[in-house]
C-alpha cells in the first residue's frame, strides 16, 4: 500500500498524495524528484515496481517477501537497490526486533518499501511536509537522510540495553535468581542481533562514501562517511556492551557459587556438631547387658549435659574461627 508519494517539481513546488497516474507521469518526465513510500507491498504495488519503475524481478521479490534479508547494496546501473535495517528494543520483553527498509535510488526518484511502520520513515515524511528543501538536494541526499535517521534511532536502543545491563548487574550481585540468568542470556542474544545488523551496514556506508556508485554525488559522499563513522561508534559501543554482559554473567555465576558455598558451609558445620553426638548415642545404643551407666539414676541427664557441652563448645570454637 502506497503510504505517501511526494513530487518536487522543477519549479520547486512540492506535491503530496499523488495518484498512481501522477506517479507514472512524473516518472516519465525524468525531471524533478519523486519519492514513493510503500508499506506492506500489495499486488498492485508489485505491479508498480515491476511495470512502471521496471525494477528487477529479484529485488521486487525481496520487497514482497516477509523474510528479513541481510543488509546489502545492488547496482543496476540506472538505479541502486539498498537494504538497511532498523532496530526496536522492547525493554519489557527484552527482545530486539529487526525492521527492514528497502530503498531504490534512481536518477530522479527514491522508492522506499517496508513491511511495518518505521519511525525513521515517518519522521522523514513529517520533515518533508514541513520543509521541501530536504528534497531539493537530490536523491542521494534524500536517501542519506532516511538512512541517517534510521541509524540515529539505534542509539536509544543501546542506551536502553545499557540500562538493562546495569539493572541485571545489581540483581546478579545482590539477589541472583533464575529469572536473572534468563534475562542475561536474552540480553546477550539481543546484543548479537544488534551486531549482525551493524557490521554489514557499516560496509555498505563505506562503499557509498568512496565513490563506488555513480548515483552518489561527490558532495553527498562525505555525508555517507558521517553515517559510516556513526556506525563505527555504535559498533564500539555494542562490543563494549557485549563485554559488560559477559561480566554480568560472570558476576551472576560467582554470586550463585558463593551462595552455594555458604549453604554448604552451614550444612558442614551442622554435620560436624552432630558427629560426636551421634558417636555418643551410638555407643549407648549398642544394648550390651553389662553397661553400668544404663542402670545409673542420673545417667540419662548426664549424657544430655555432656552432649550439650560438646555442641556448645563446637559452636564457640567455630565462632572464634569465624566460620559462623
Cite the ranges covered by each PLM segment.
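Hydrophobic alpha-helical transmembrane segments and their immediately adjacent juxtamembrane loops
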Residues: 229-324
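Peripheral, non-transmembrane regulatory/ligand-interaction domains of membrane transport proteins
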Residues: 1-219, 223-226, 230-233, 240, ...
Amino acid at each position: 500500500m502506497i503510504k505517501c508519494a511526494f513530487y518536487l517539481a522543477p519549479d520547486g513546488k512540492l506535491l503530496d498524495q499523488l495518484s498512481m497516474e501522477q506517479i507514472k507521469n512524473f516518472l516519465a518526465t525524468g525531471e524533478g524528484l519523486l519519492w514513493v513510500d510503500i508499506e506492506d507491498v500489495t499486488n498492485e504495488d508489485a505491479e508498480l515496481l515491476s511495470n512502471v519503475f521496471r525494477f528487477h524481478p529479484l529485488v521486487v521479490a525481496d520487497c514482497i517477501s516477509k523474510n528479513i534479508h541481510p543488509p546489502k547494496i545492488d547496482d543496476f546501473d540506472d538505479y541502486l537497490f539498498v537494504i538497511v535495517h532498523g532496530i526496536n528494543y522492547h525493554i519489557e520483553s527484552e527482545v530486539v526486533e529487526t525492521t527492514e527498509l528497502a530503498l531504490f535510488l534512481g536518477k530522479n526518484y527514491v522508492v522506499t518499501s517496508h513491511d511495518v511502520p518505521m519511525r525513521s520513515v515517518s519522521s522523514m515524511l513529517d520533515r518533508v511536509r514541513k520543509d521541501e528543501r530536504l528534497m531539493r538536494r537530490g536523491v542521494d541526499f534524500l536517501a542519506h537522510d532516511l538512512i541517517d535517521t534510521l541509524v540515529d534511532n539505534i542509539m536509544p536502543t543501546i542506551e536502553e540495553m545499557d540500562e538493562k545491563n546495569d539493572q541485571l548487574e545489581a540483581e546478579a550481585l545482590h539477589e541472583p535468581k533464575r529469572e536473572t540468568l534468563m534475562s542475561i542470556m536474552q540480553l546477550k542474544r539481543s546484543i548479537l542481533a544488534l551486531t549482525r545488523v551493524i557490521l554489514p551496514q557499516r560496509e555498505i556506508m563505506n562503499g557509498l562514501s568512496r565513490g563506488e556508485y555513480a548515483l552518489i554525488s561527490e558532495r553527498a559522499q562525505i555525508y555517507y562517511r558521517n553515517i559510516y563513522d556513526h556506525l563505527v561508534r555504535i559498533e564500539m559501543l555494542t562490543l563494549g556492551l557485549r563485554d559488560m554482559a559477559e561480566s554480568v554473567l560472570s558476576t551472576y555465576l560467582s554470586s550463585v557459587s558463593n551462595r552455594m558455598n555458604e549453604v554448604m558451609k552451614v550444612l558442614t558445620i551442622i554435620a560436624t556438631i552432630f558427629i560426636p553426638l551421634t558417636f555418643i548415642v551410638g555407643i549407648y545404643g549398642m544394648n550390651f547387658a553389662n553397661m553400668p551407666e544404663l542402670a545409673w539414676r542420673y545417667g540419662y541427664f548426664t549424657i544430655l549435659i555432656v552432649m550439650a557441652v560438646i555442641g556448645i563448645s563446637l559452636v564457640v570454637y567455630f565462632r572464634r574461627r569465624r566460620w559462623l
